[in-house]
A protein has these predicted regions:
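Cross-family detector of peptidyl-prolyl cis-trans isomerase
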Residues: 2-339
């Protein structure tokens, strides 16, 4: 569980802009510690001992006289056999972060998620585990130094990273109450590796009458051709061009997706994740994106390619002064995962 104010501060601080998440010190050296190729392996040095099966909440114990880490230590407790994690990949992962210098409290524990009390009172523990969606070696949910040791690890692995809090968390460690010489322990269950430059796979269906044509392949933005002489539809329209077989997208999840957006009036691309060399990650169904996306993408499936035509009132119509305020928008969205 996350019982303390420090844990709440970690969530709050890690939500600030990426500029504040830059690690103060570079990457640490990896240790050669105990590695396992099955469930129930153990890592111990010199701060924490971690035990437990992949997929179950890890047990982390710290002896009172344990030495504090001076170098970053990386242990693969359970060796997976899936794809390797590459620099910049997205991960679906179980995550536990503990400060052994503060009564062994958990700063983050996705095996014991917290939810708001509907009565408006204190938070209550939820009934089941969740996963974190994070990007490796990039300012994201965690600072780069905390995830860089996962590069080269295989999907399906349980990994323990422990070391200096200042080095792994960065300058914000002091905001969280850490002092020089304090340690921090991360336990990752790497459930899914998502290629940040990937596309969904499958045969694309012909577009419906009156919908833009779409060509999407490689690592370039999709080519969107507006039907000649057609007025834009007045209502929100969408079509699944490639049907995925993954889980249904639920409101409140973090969507990891590639997308290209073009204006109906001239067909010009105004935004694309491909221009940033990585998929985008955002909350869906919670008002973080335009209304048309929330309405269509909730209920889609992971692996879908979705074509959306969005009228101004469900696009940027409410954003006064926006360049696209009066524009009908066309998007092609590849849903890579929903965490």
């Amino acid at each position: 569980m996350i019982p303390t104010k420090r844990a709440h501060r970690l969530v709050a601080v890690l939500a600030v802009p990426a500029l504040l998440l830059t690690a103060a010190c570079g990457n640490g050296d990896s240790g050669n510690g105990d590695s396992g190729d099955g469930d129930g392996a153990t890592a111990s040095w010199p701060v924490a001992t971690v035990t437990g099966d992949m997929g179950e909440e890890p047990e982390v114990t710290v002896e009172e006289d344990a030495e504090r880490a001076e170098e970053t230590r990386v242990d693969v407790l359970v060796q997976g056999d899936g794809p390797e994690v590459s620099d910049g990949d997205f991960l679906r992962t179980g995550l536990l972060v503990r400060s052994p210098d503060a009564e062994q409290e958990d700063l983050v524990n996705t095996w014991r998620p917290m939810v708001a009390d509907p009565e408006g009172g204190e938070e209550q523990e939820d009934s089941g585990p969740v996963y974190a969606a994070l990007r490796v070696n990039v300012d994201d949910l965690l600072p780069p130094a905390a995830t860089e040791p996962l590069i080269g690890v295989n999907e399906g692995s349980r990994v323990v990273v422990q070391g200096s809090a200042v080095e792994l968390i960065g300058d914000i460690a002091t905001q969280l109450g850490f002092e020089e010489g304090d340690s921090v322990v991360f336990v990752y269950d790497v459930v899914t590796v998502i290629d940040a430059q990937g596309r969904v796979e499958g045969e694309q269906a012909p577009v419906e009458e009156g919908m833009p044509e779409v060509e999407a392949e490689g690592t370039e933005p999709a080519e969107i051709t507006i039907p000649e002489g057609e007025d834009p539809p007045q209502e929100l329209r969408s079509q699944v061009l490639i049907e995925g077989d993954g889980p249904e997208v639920e409101a409140g999840t973090q969507l990891i997706a590639q997308y290209t957006g073009a204006a109906w009036s001239d067909g010009e691309v105004f935004d694309s994740s491909w221009s940033r060399d990585a998929a985008a990650k955002f909350g869906i169904g919670v008002g973080q994106v335009i209304q048309g996306w929330d309405e269509v993408l909730v209920g889609s499936n992971v692996g879908d390619r979705v074509l959306l035509v969005i009228p101004p009132d469900k696009g940027y119509g409410a954003s006064e002064g926006h360049d696209l305020q009066e524009e009908t928008l066309v998007f092609v969205v590849d849903i890579l995962d929903a965490v």
